[in-house]
Amino acid sequence: MIEFDNLSEKKDNQHITLENGNVFLTNYQTIVITVNCAGVMGKGIALQAKDLFPDAFLYYKDLCDKDKMHMGVPVLYNKRSNSLQTTDKEYKKLLLFPTKQHWKMPANIVSIEKGLQWLVDNYKKCGIKSLAIPALGCGNGGLEWRDVGPLLYKYLGKMNIPVQIFLPRQNIPKKHLTEKFLLTEPPKITDY
């Protein structure tokens, strides 16, 4: 875990930590699952989610088959299994977060930003009390942490709940893990 101490800019984002490891091992209430809109959970975090939560996969597949999974609009799935309770005895929630239209395509940072705004606007209404989120679009999506990190920090910093950001497995320069870097304004959507 990487926490930021003794930084004057840290006033608003004290609830965010950067984590190495497996997002599914968190004790946080809500886990973000990166998905596409084609109904396929074939690689990465999505495949792990399919194996761990087959009921969530069926729900997600049904949404895709009915054309109800859209870029920029995450969907909350309330897990109803006793095996995945959080420390406060609430059931896990899974937030299905589209990062790609089709599994063959790269991740879309414009839609990721729209989805993050949706999350900021709706997390209270959805009852999200703590959030574990991977580096959206990094890994199989082909995006770079240097672009995604500041974007995540910008939006998740607006949420008044504990947030764990799970870092991608790629080597990240140490300067891209600093508070100073993460507080920089992310690239404008028009830059893509």
Predicted regions: what they are:
Residues 1-192:
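Macrodomain-like recognition of ADP-ribose-binding/processing modules
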